[in-house]
UniProtKB/Swiss-Prot annotation:
Segments for region (Type E(+) motif): 560-590
Chain spans, region Type DYW motif: 592-689
The protein, known as: Putative pentatricopeptide repeat-containing protein At3g15130
Keyword Repeat attached: yes
Organism: Arabidopsis thaliana
PPR repeats: 5-39, 40-70, 71-105, 106-140, 141-171, 172-206, 209-243, 246-276, 277-311, 312-342, 347-377, 378-412, 413-448, 449-479
Underlying gene: PCMP-H86
Pfam families per UniProt: DYW_deaminase, E_motif, PPR, PPR_2
C-alpha cells in the first residue's frame, strides 16, 4: 500500500473516531485487512482508538491481540477505552501488565490511569502512580499535573491537590478548572471563588469555559453564597455566556437560585432555557417541593411528563424523596402513580424511593409490600428497609432483614451497617448491637467510622452504662467528632449524670464553640437537675455569642392542606381555637389521668402557670391541637399523623400518650429520631427514644 493511500485511510479513521462512526470505521478496517500490507503499528493504534471511542471494546481487543508489535500508544489507547467505557479497574490492570512487559508510560498513560484512580477513589494506587511520575520526571508536565490535582481532589486529599497545583509552572485552563472543581468537591466554596480570582489575575490565554463557570455556580449553591452567585451571574451576562442556548450554565443558575431559596429568580432562569435538560426540570420541581409549594411542583412534573416521556430515574427518585422527607403521603402516592407509567419508573432507585416514602409516612405494611414485589434489590434497597424498621422501633425486624440480605449474597456497606446498629440502639438491643459491631471489620472488612462508634455509645448509654460509653470514646482508634460527644451529653441528661455531663460539655464548648446546640444541651442538663444558676450561665454564654438554636417545627395535613407550625408561634388563623382545644385536652387529662407530668420537665426557672403555657406552645402540640379543633375530641378510631423536625420532648410524649387513652384516637408522630405510634395510652417506642 502506498504511503499516501495509508495516510488517507488514517484520516478517515480519525473522522470516524471523532464522529462515532463505528460501521464506517469497520469498513476501513476490512479494507486494510484485505490489502495485505495495510495494517502496521500506526494504523492498528488508530483502529484501537476508533473502536474504543465508538464503544466497541471487543473489536479494540481483537486488533490489540493481533498486533505483532505494540508500543506505549497501543497500550494507552486501550486503557483510555477502558476508562471511557467505565471499566476503571481494567485500565489499571493493563497499566500493571504494560509495566511487566517493560514498556514505559507516557504523559497520556499517566493521565488516563490517574483519572481511573480518582473515579475509583483508589488513593493508594494513585499514590503509587504519583511516585512513578516523580521517579521518571513526569510530574511537572502540565497534563500529568492536572490529572494529579483531579485524582487527589476526588480521593478527598484537597491539600495534596493544592500542593501539586502550586508546582505546575505553565498552568492551562484545565489546571485551573481541576483546582476549582476540587475545592467545590471538598466543600470549600470560598476557596473555589478565590482560585477563580487568581486565575483572572494570572491573565491566562484561554477564557473561562462552561466547566469553569458551572463549577463556580456549584460553589455558590452548595454553600448558600447567593451574593457571590449573583456576581457570577453578572459575569456570565457580561461575558456572553448567559444565553438560552447555554443549557448547562443556565441549569446551574436554576440550581443556585433554588438552593438559596430564590424561586422567582430560579423560574426566570428556567424559562429562558430553550433546550431544558432533565437536571434543570428536576432542580426547579425539587425547589418548589422543598419550599412547600407542592401544587406547583406537581404541576411542573405533569408538564414535564407531557413534554418528555423519558424522565430519568434520578429525577423521579429525587422528587419522591422530597415528598418522603415531608411525609406527604397523598403527593407521594400521586407521584408513584405517575412513575409506574414511565420506563424509568420501575428502576431500582425509583422503587427504593417509593419504599422509603411509605416508611417515612408511617405505612410499614405498604413499604413491605413494595419491597417484596421488587425484582432487583441492591444494598440501598435493603438499607432503606433496615433504616425504616429501626425508626419504627422494630429492631428485631431490622436485624432479621440484615441477615436475610447476607443470605442473598449482598455485602453491606458502611451506611447499611450504620442503619442496623442504629436500629439496635433505638430498640435497646445491646447484645445484638455489640455482636454486629464486632463483625464490622472482622467479617465484612469495613473500617468503622466515628458514626458506627456513636451508635455503640448510644447503645451503652441508653442502658445506663455511661462510663463504658465514655471509655469507648477515649480508646477508639479514630478522633471523636462533635456528634459522638453530643450523643454522650444527651445520655448524661437522660440519666441525670451531671458530673460526667459537665466534663463532656466542656469538651464540646472547647472544640465546637459556635454550635448553639451545645449550649442548649448544657442548659437542658442543668435545667432538668434544677441547677438554675448554671442553666442561666449556659444560656447567657450562648446569647453573648449571638447563637440561636434551631426552631422546632411540626406539620400536619388536614383536608389536603399541609399546615406548618413553629414552637411559640401564634400566626395561624385558628390559634385561639387551637389554644382552647389544648386547654380542654389538658383539663380532661388532669381529671381523668392526673396529668401534671410536664411541669417538672419544662426546663426554665419560671412559675408553673408560665411553664404550662410554654409547653402548650410546642409545635407538635399546636399541630395536634389543629387536628383536634377541626375534627373534635371525639374521633374514635381515627389516626392523626404529625411530623416534627426535632426530637419530641418528654412532656409532649407523655401528653400524647395520655391523649391517645382519653380520646381513643391513634397518633403517629415522626420526629428527628424515630416514629412514635401512640395508642390507648402506650407508645411503640416503649418510652425509649
Amino acid at each position: 500500500m502506498i504511503p499516501n493511500q495509508r495516510q488517507n485511510l488514517v484520516s478517515i479513521l480519525r473522522v470516524c473516531t471523532r464522529k462515532g462512526l463505528s460501521d464506517q470505521g469497520g469498513q476501513v478496517h476490512c479494507y486494510l485487512l484485505k490489502s495485505g500490507s495495510g495494517l502496521n503499528l500506526i494504523t492498528s493504534n488508530y483502529l484501537i482508538d476508533m473502536y474504543c471511542k465508538c464503544r466497541e471494546p471487543l473489536m479494540a481487543y481483537k486488533v490489540f491481540d493481533s498486533m505483532p508489535e505494540r508500543n506505549v500508544v497501543s497500550w494507552s489507547a486501550l486503557m483510555s477505552g477502558h476508562v471511557l467505557n467505565g471499566d476503571l479497574k481494567g485500565s489499571l490492570s493493563l497499566f500493571s501488565e504494560m509495566g511487566r512487559q517493560g514498556i514505559y508510560p507516557n504523559e497520556f498513560t499517566f493521565s488516563t490511569n490517574l483519572k481511573a484512580c480518582g473515579l475509583l477513589n483508589a488513593l493508594e494506587k494513585g499514590l503509587q502512580i504519583h511516585g512513578f511520575c516523580l521517579k521518571i520526571g513526569f510530574e511537572m508536565m502540565v497534563e500529568v499535573g492536572n490529572s494529579l490535582v483531579d485524582m487527589y481532589s476526588k480521593c478527598g486529599r484537597i491539600n495534596e491537590a493544592e500542593k501539586v497545583f502550586r508546582r505546575i509552572v505553565d498552568r492551562s485552563l484545565i489546571s485551573w478548572n481541576a483546582m476549582i472543581a476540587g475545592f467545590v468537591h471538598a466543600g470549600y466554596g470560598s476557596k473555589a471563588l478565590d482560585t477563580f480570582g487568581m486565575m483572572q489575575e494570572a491573565n491566562i490565554k484561554e477564557r473561562p469555559d462552561e466547566f469553569t463557570l458551572t463549577s463556580l455556580l456549584k460553589a455558590c449553591s452548595s454553600t448558600g453564597m447567593i451574593y457571590a452567585g449573583k456576581q457570577i451571574h453578572g459575569f456570565l451576562v457580561r461575558s456572553g455566556f448567559h444565553c438560552p442556548s447555554s443549557a448547562t450554565i443556565t441549569g446551574s443558575l436554576v440550581d443556585l437560585y433554588v438552593k438559596c431559596g430564590y424561586l422567582f429568580s430560579a423560574r426566570k432562569a428556567f424559562d429562558q432555557i430553550k433546550e431544558k435538560t432533565m437536571i434543570s426540570w428536576s432542580s426547579l420541581i425539587l425547589g418548589y417541593a422543598q419550599e412547600g409549594e407542592f401544587v406547583e411542583a406537581m404541576g411542573l412534573f405533569k408538564r414535564l411528563q407531557e413534554l418528555n416521556s423519558q424522565i430519568d430515574s434520578f429525577a423521579l427518585s429525587s422528587i419522591i424523596g422530597v415528598f418522603a422527607d415531608f411525609a406527604l403521603l397523598r403527593q407521594g402516592k400521586q407521584m408513584q402513580a405517575l412513575a409506574v407509567k414511565l420506563p424509568s419508573g420501575l428502576e431500582t432507585s425509583v422503587l427504593n424511593s417509593v419504599v422509603d416514602m411509605y416508611l417515612k409516612c408511617g405505612l410499614v405494611d405498604e413499604a413491605e409490600k413494595c419491597f417484596a414485589e421488587m425484582q432487583l434489590k441492591d444494598v440501598i434497597s435493603w438499607t432503606v428497609v433496615i433504616t425504616g424498621y429501626g425508626k419504627h422501633g422494630l429492631g428485631k425486624k431490622s436485624v432479621r432483614i440484615f441477615y436475610e440480605m447476607l443470605r442473598h449474597n449482598i455485602e453491606p456497606d458502611e451506611v447499611c451497617y450504620l442503619a442496623v446498629l442504629s436500629a439496635c440502639s433505638h430498640s435497646g438491643m445491646i447484645k445484638e448491637g455489640e455482636e454486629l459491631f464486632s463483625k464490622l471489620l472482622e467479617t465484612h472488612g469495613i473500617k468503622p467510622r466515628v458514626e458506627h462508634y456513636a451508635c455503640v455509645v448510644d447503645l451503652l448509654g441508653r442502658a445506663g452504662r455511661l462510663k463504658e460509653a465514655k471509655h469507648l470514646i477515649d480508646t477508639m482508634p479514630i478522633k471523636p467528632n462533635v456528634g459522638i460527644w453530643q450523643t454522650l451529653l444527651s445520655l448524661c441528661r437522660v440519666h441525670g449524670d451531671i458530673e460526667l455531663g459537665k466534663e463532656v460539655g466542656k469538651i464540646l464548648l472547647r472544640i465546637d464553640a459556635k454550635n448553639p446546640a451545645n449550649y442548649v444541651m448544657m442548659s437542658n442538663l442543668y435545667g432538668q437537675a434544677g441547677y438554675w444558676n448554671e442553666q442561666g450561665n449556659a444560656r447567657e454564654l450562648g446569647n453573648i455569642k449571638g447563637l440561636k438554636k434551631e426552631a422546632g417545627m411540626s406539620w400536619v395535613e388536614i383536608e389536603r392542606e399541609v399546615h406548618f407550625f413553629r414552637s411559640g408561634e401564634d400566626s395561624h388563623p385558628l390559634t385561639p381555637v387551637i389554644q382552647e382545644t389544648l386547654k380542654e385536652a389538658e383539663r380532661r387529662l388532669r381529671e381523668e389521668l392526673g396529668y401534671v407530668y410536664g411541669l417538672k420537665h419544662e426546663l426554665h426557672d419560671i412559675d408553673d402557670e408560665s411553664k404550662e403555657e410554654n409547653l402548650r406552645a410546642h409545635s407538635e402540640k399546636l399541630a395536634i391541637g389543629l387536628a383536634l379543633a377541626t375534627g373534635g375530641l371525639n374521633q374514635k378510631g381515627k389516626t392523626i399523623r404529625v411530623f416534627k423536625n426535632l426530637r419530641v420532648c418528654v412532656d409532649c410524649h407523655e401528653f400524647i400518650k395520655g391523649l391517645s387513652k382519653i380520646t381513643k384516637i391513634a397518633y403517629v408522630v415522626r420526629d428527628a429520631v424515630r416514629f412514635h405510634s401512640f395508642e390507648d395510652g402506650c407508645c411503640s417506642c416503649g418510652d425509649y427514644w
